[in-house]
């Protein structure tokens, strides 16, 4: 029993033709029998109907697909399995021993979770007869080869005994819908047959009418040819046949096993005795059938064929006896009797003659066939030969494989179907082997076989490749056979041949000639109707419609609207496997007038996707115009066209008015200088101060508490960390600012003097020409005590004076060597020589003045504060007589080294505060440090810069804009949304927004250079003329994204939204109320009931509106469901949500990860191939029920668990997509273990394996679309989205990348780094020897090729493989060097 357990999701992988849609829609209105030629796609109509039945809602009922044969049953099941991969379907046939299923429990368990059952008619009839299945359980009953529903056939008995009685008793709702499929509704050419068939099936027989012209393009009628052969001359036959007939005539019945007495002698007059007397025993019946078959082979094929058949059959029997010699049961005795009987035949002598290649004695009929086949020498040949008896099939196929005229031209095979009947196989002469022929039809479809000899089993139903030649070795039995066989020859310019003997040439041939003439007349009549239709199309009908837009004067008329409608569809995003052209279909009324319907691509909103014309027309041309006009007007009224009547995608609503292209380098405002305001404030100061404390490695430094004084309110300052050396970390902490109530001018003057003293103390030269500092510093003393403090600490003394007072080195001031231009030193100790010369052992003040960053190398310098001793420090010996000693102690003097850092921090804080008070006044930042970071350009070389925040803000901006566009433009297709988002978030738009807002003046680009630092002065700031600076356009865009990231960190999505609005007014100020927007949207009528509960549980989310999940699983190629939009909109939203979930995780992990590495990690974990891999891996567990035979001969229901992957739920209509999907799944099976090992145990990201996987985009699209669906249904709950990403395994891998430091650098980047940029990659698309597109990548260095990679399926694979080989090459070369 074949089974397909999946979800309830459906999707057709074939895009139906218009005439198939016509028949499908007719089947929705009433029960019909679809009558179309073989090969025109009747099964596709059934698939459409099945999909509609599953998605139609209402009570859950079974769809039962009935076929006349087991082979056809298995074939149709495979069609359903491939076209509707997620449907739960199964087959029930005689191969399952269904006749022995005698328990209701077995049937109930098997069918409880099934949606589609495929079986033969007899299976369903017996199940209904015994009450295991009730007609009321069925929702749709499909009769393949519906012409069988006549007389006492099981197909008709289903209708007679169950359907019609239930219909009469309980009404139409109690019986299933009926869909019949046939190529020949009339079997015996009787006019009454069609009416009888319609009555039996309670259906109307229909063929396409409106789209008949399209149907004719797919129904190629063959040329009908007779093959005339001489009449069969019944002769005595060959040596083997004559010997066989003689042995049969003279056989001694006493040796027959049935003649041997068992349990006593046979009683005279018993049944066994009578059978024995008339030679009706088993063995004699076997021999008789063998003789009859041999005689038939001789008559049909000739002496050679009959001898070959007899000899081969005898050898097969002997082989069977040898293989079963150990089990001598009654059947073996029968075989032994037959073998002994046949041993009288001269097999060895006949076989010797058969080996002679010149001894092909053929019948006239076979000779005529071979001569006919000899005319065909086409490498693309495919043909069928229909014969009457099964025995002829195998022998003729073998003969054609051996004959000199055919053996090298045709690849022959035999096919007689899968059914073995209820009787056991004959022991002699029956060559049928169901297992050997199981792959025959696949071989024929693939071209491995090109000529099949068969019986009537291939007349109908079974999918057979369109043939070049069809030969009837025997005349068709009836009109049905004639039509069915003719339908197999449906290649263009095909041939349909019927063999006749000269004996009946004037009888039967005339009958077929008359029939052919009738067919020709029908063809001619059809051609006449087509010419009449073409003439009707030439009639110019006036379509009086017009669309006018007064605001622009735009006008569209019916004469131009078709072109415009095609243009609208053409500018929609191109999608692989999808044809975006509009599809027109038609219907006719009783007067023959036509009304049109147009269906737009599935990415268009369902409300305007299917538009019907309003009027009836004489010609299709006029109907197309009027229908296209109605569609275009609907698009305009729906908001998908602008006032110029053009698609919004070429002129989005939110496109900025200024389209000027900005250069990459811009002249922008100079960096905002807060000291200008402070300089002006000193004219009327409101003096404030704050205390500054110094700590060293977490411990307070004695005596180092200073004050910062300003002319206005001071902003709170964050602590400053300074790196004195590798082992010493200093921290400057700032107290809360406070106002100084009374400050005299004299005090301010003293403060300026103190500030000058601090700044000058650690420097060698007096760099100060003025002391009108904007910022002032002083000791932690009342302002009234500054004068005394200056007396004690200002100035200097000679080194001898300090030495004579016994001043200890640690309490001394800065030592200045007068012989070296007052170079400052730290005093380490006094040294007095034997001659009385006083020297000072000194150590230099650190030359490194920027203490914001740790030193690259340990310079080993010590200072008096930390009292560190380093033997490696550079020591200077200075004579005391050439030195002076500053009065200001070293412990206080070094504060002058920190003033540039304090002023720089104060400046950046004032700039950030000014930005928050102006442009960002509505945001309300709580932590100004976020703003400082966001506006700090990398060129400023600060402790932080905007790059990390920009990484975060980029995803937040994308998320905010995507959500707004998605929810505020529910009518927009994905292409409009994507272009709208790109217009808003692209760098040129952000750059223009930054300039318009004046953000350029707040971006900090000046680097702090303490060695050349000059304190800001009042005199240089007041009246300074504004200047310009140059800045990269990208920096302006980056800072906006960084500020959005800063706002998010400061106050979540609400502040990020406000911040975005400050720069982009088209973005809402407040986040959308998603729950209220969801409740406003209409729930569709799509198949919510088909969504599997197991799937939702495994997704980690249960949908309130299951339509969203169905939409998320609907590929753009899915055309059969016109009420559900494709997943593209949800995929657009999910793409942004994926970033919004992943990026914060990466950002928050550690600030030690560089922005560049964060970007590499993000790109690696959201890589489409990785998402596609997780999609292939993600599956749910479902129970599968099947019936198995137990050892005691009973039947039992067995349940087992199987995995159903997420991709199976995707709904689509594309054969190409299925082919690509299956190829990708094959690659997945081949690469799966390698990829899993790399993901969960390897040190590096599996770039090469994932590129070889080459997962089609729709695999990753499903992940993103489901993510979008969860977000919408949950009302914008990102945590629900996180749970889904956790379920598929993505978040656990992200954590592993972060925790284990997985190397995610792309191999090409590594190769470029190792080669120092000298490796040049050249990627080309080429064709292989079979004409398939492949990729080749070469790598050259210094004009020499070092790597060549070929035969890759995609450019990514070629490039990655080439990069890895380049890395190996460079590493080997380095080892040699």
UniProtKB/Swiss-Prot annotation:
Documented EC number(s): 3.1.26.-, 3.6.4.-
List of residues binding Mg(2+): 1131, 1261, 1264
GO BP field: defense response to virus; regulation of defense response to virus; siRNA processing
Cofactor(s) needed by this chain: Mg(2+); Mn(2+)
Residue ranges annotated for the Dicer dsRNA-binding fold domain, each copy included: 561-655
GO molecular function annotation: ATP binding; helicase activity; metal ion binding; ribonuclease III activity; RNA binding
Family per similarity comment: Belongs to the helicase family. Dicer subfamily.
Residues annotated as domain Helicase ATP-binding: 23-203
Identification of the protein by name: Dicer-like protein 2
Gene3D superfamilies: Dicer dimerisation domain, P-loop containing nucleotide triphosphate hydrolases, Ribonuclease III domain
Keywords from the named record: Antiviral defense, Antiviral protein, ATP-binding, Helicase, Hydrolase, Magnesium, Manganese, Metal-binding, Nucleotide-binding, Repeat, RNA-binding
Organism: Aspergillus oryzae (strain ATCC 42149 / RIB 40) (Yellow koji mold)
InterPro entries, A to Z: DEAD/DEAH_box_helicase_dom, Dicer_dimer_sf, Dicer_dimerisation_dom, Helicase_ATP-bd, Helicase_C-like, P-loop_NTPase, RNase_III_dom, RNase_III_sf
